[in-house]
Curated annotation (Swiss-Prot):
Species lineage: Bacteria, Pseudomonadati, Pseudomonadota, Alphaproteobacteria, Hyphomicrobiales
Enzyme Commission number(s) of this protein: 2.3.2.29
Domain of life (superkingdom): Bacteria
Organism this protein belongs to: Rhodopseudomonas palustris (strain BisB18)
GO biological process: ubiquitin-dependent protein catabolic process via the N-end rule pathway
Protein name: Aspartate/glutamate leucyltransferase
Localization, UniProt: Cytoplasm
Role: Functions in the N-end rule pathway of protein degradation where it conjugates Leu from its aminoacyl-tRNA to the N-termini of proteins containing an N-terminal aspartate or glutamate.
């Protein structure tokens, strides 16, 4: 019998299931487990190839007749916020982001639960319990952090701590960028456009860290849930031939491969 090292990834294919993004279609995924001493290196490599992480699993679409899911990453150092995005930054000037270890809290879960109940009541995560949430945050063998976004308080300049929790981002730190694994926000703060604000904040953080990219996951043209990811330009989109650059003008060009 062939023996496989714990650090050698084994890939599996899921059975077809209804697509959550495009009505009338079915999805399949190829996945592997991110475990062992080289989990971080493997996560970097697979993310470069269009995979996403969910807990200790890396996956990517492997649908039979559809290629609508396109992995995208923002070119952080060249990004320039649009007029609308600058307004969102100004609207959230009273918000600070606190980088923390990937440790779940009851306060986070309260916001998470409110977000699901308002935004994704019938989605696949709708029934997640506090233990499920804890697993989502803690079950990681890679460099994962939590960013808590809080309203700035009178002592924030001294303590670095904000007041009430507004939003949370679960983020992986890769060798070439930040990967936004999952984010959520207080639904009663819709006017702040906190989802957009968190992406803009990640772009700024990547710049400060000297990291070239922010990985947003899958852009799906025509999907109300995923189409927004195409607004952050310039960005690169993964095609069969490699990463293709899309400029603010909408023009595209094949990027040199690393």
């Amino acid at each position: 019998m062939t023996q496989h090292s714990r650090d050698t990834p084994q890939f599996y294919l899921t059975a077809p299931s209804p697509c959550p993004y495009l009505p009338g279609r079915h999805e399949r995924k190829v996945f592997t487990h991110l475990v062992g001493g080289k989990a971080g290196e493997l996560n970097d490599l697979l993310t470069h190839g269009g995979f996403r992480r969910s807990q200790s699993i890396a996956y990517r679409p492997a649908c039979d007749q559809c290629r609508a899911c396109v992995s995208v990453r923002v070119v952080a150092n060249e990004f320039r916020a649009s007029r609308g995005q600058r307004k969102i930054l100004a609207r959230n000037a009273d918000v600070i982001g606190e980088l923390r270890s990937a440790v779940p809290t009851s306060e986070q879960y309260s916001v998470f639960r409110a977000y699901l109940d308002r935004r994704h009541r019938h989605g696949g995560m709708a029934d997640m319990t506090v233990l499920d949430y804890a697993m989502m945050v803690e079950d990681s063998h890679v460099k994962t952090r939590i960013i808590e976004y809080r309203r700035r308080g009178p002592d924030s300049g001294i303590t670095g701590r904000g007041e009430d929790l507004l939003a949370v981002a679960l983020t992986d730190i890769l060798n070439d960028g930040l990967s936004m694994v999952y984010s959520f926000f207080e639904p009663g703060e819709d006017s702040r456009s906190l989802g957009t604000f968190m992406i803009l904040d990640h772009i700024a953080r990547a710049r400060r860290l000297g990291l070239p990219y922010v990985y947003l996951g899958y852009w799906i043209e025509g999907s109300k849930k995923m189409d927004y990811k195409g607004r952050y330009l310039p960005q690169q989109r993964l095609a069969p031939s490699g990463w293709i650059r899309v400029d603010a003008s909408g023009e595209s060009a094949v990027e040199p491969q690393d």
